[in-house]
Amino acid sequence: MSTNPLVWQQATVRIQQFYRLTKPRVVSLIVFTAVIGMFLSVPGAVPLDKLLLGTIGISLVAGAAAALNCLVEYKFDAIMARTKGRPLPQGKVSVPETLFFLVMVGGLGLFILHQWINPLTMWLTLGTFVGYAIIYTVILKPLTPQNIVIGGASGAMPPVLGWAAITGEISADALLLFLIIFAWTPPHFWALALYRKSDYAKIGMPMLPVTHGEEFTRLHVLLYTIILCIATVLPYLTQMSGLIYLVSVLILDAIFLYYAIRIYLHYTDQIAREAFRYSIIYLALLFTALLVDHYFYF
């Protein structure tokens, strides 16, 4: 009996390591946009069963994709300061264990989506998994500095998945949400790549600051932020959203543009770090504004 507390403690630590493989902070933002997509897809209440099961299914597959990313890049992660503390580089979980875990978790998520949501959502989610974990992580990321731009399509899919989970179809409004995240992805990741340039150079990863230099990357952060600001006004222009969203997004855009201009004109690593952190808050608040406006539209 005296060994029971130790056994439970060891089991808890193991569970925590597998949980860390799913990159919960990253996945939480992904799932949040998917859930908002669910609410925006219908004028009234969202069916509770589809909301819960759709969220669980999408979360599990997103976690599996993150785990596969960790598996593919664990040797690189061991070199980079930002990632060397992850479970695989630390040897806290093995490669076979990670592979088994992601297959089981991802398979369960796809089963839930097919069985209790609809086949369209399951196939779209599987396509998103393949796009992120294989096309982006395995092929594009080590091949081209445009990896973020091309691979951003898979990262922009969650609100479309949420929309399809409730309605069983893809609408033009869902594609607007896709467009917003697609435009958001380059300035978000390039801000990170700027102040982590030495890490990426160390592992030979062709991120834009490594291949084209800081000045070129800073310019593209600004250009893509301008594109993002244009894209985020489209929900209002198409009458998908109203004044609450418009006022909110103009404020959010102004702050993002402020950071992008500072990155371009007066770059420091600290400014890039602040811009990266703000970009996460920005996306969360933008989708929150979409949700509030959806139910209080005027």
Curated annotation (Swiss-Prot):
It is found in: Cell inner membrane. One of its GO terms (molecular function) is protoheme IX farnesyltransferase activity. Keywords: Cell inner membrane, Cell membrane, Heme biosynthesis, Membrane, Transferase, Transmembrane, Transmembrane helix. It holds the Pfam family UbiA. It is a multi-pass membrane protein. GO terms for biological process: heme O biosynthetic process. The chain crosses the membrane at residues 26-46, 52-72, 93-113, 120-140, 148-168, 174-194, 219-239, 241-261, 278-298. Its EC number is 2.5.1.141. One of its GO terms (cellular component) is plasma membrane. It catalyses: heme b + (2E,6E)-farnesyl diphosphate + H2O = Fe(II)-heme o + diphosphate. Gene3D superfamilies: UbiA prenyltransferase. Pathway: Porphyrin-containing compound metabolism; heme O biosynthesis; heme O from protoheme: step 1/1. The keyword Transmembrane helix applies. Its main location: membrane. HAMAP family: CyoE_CtaB. Carbon 2 of the heme B porphyrin ring is defined according to the Fischer nomenclature. NCBIfam families: cyoE_ctaB, PRK04375.1-2. Converts heme B (protoheme IX) to heme O by substitution of the vinyl group on carbon 2 of heme B porphyrin ring with a hydroxyethyl farnesyl side group. Belongs to the UbiA prenyltransferase family. Protoheme IX farnesyltransferase subfamily. This is Protoheme IX farnesyltransferase.
